[in-house]
């Protein structure tokens, strides 16, 4: 899965870009006490990273 796709799905679910540090974009959600960091730009994120982001964000990233 491309990092751009992950970022689009997070933003659609209400996550806002908080900061950028190098090639890592960090997102915050006003209703969730957590942050999500996505390396960007990357063509393919590992399956393990996508699986880790899903429960934190509450967003199903692997669904079409």
Language-model regions, residue ranges each:
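Polyanion-binding surface elements
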Residues: 1-14
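Short linear Ser/Thr-Pro motifs
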Residues: 3, 21-23, 57
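C-terminal structural segments of small proteins and small subunits
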Residues: 12-13, 30-64
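Major-groove DNA-recognition helix of helix-turn-helix-type DNA-binding domains
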Residues: 13-29
């Amino acid at each position: 899965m491309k990092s751009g796709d992950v970022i689009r799905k997070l933003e659609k679910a209400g996550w806002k870009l908080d900061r950028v540090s190098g090639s890592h974009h960090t997102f915050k959600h006003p209703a969730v006490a957590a942050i999500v960091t996505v390396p960007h730009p990357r063509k393919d994120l590992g399956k393990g990273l996508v699986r880790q982001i899903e429960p934190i964000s509450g967003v199903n990233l692997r669904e079409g």
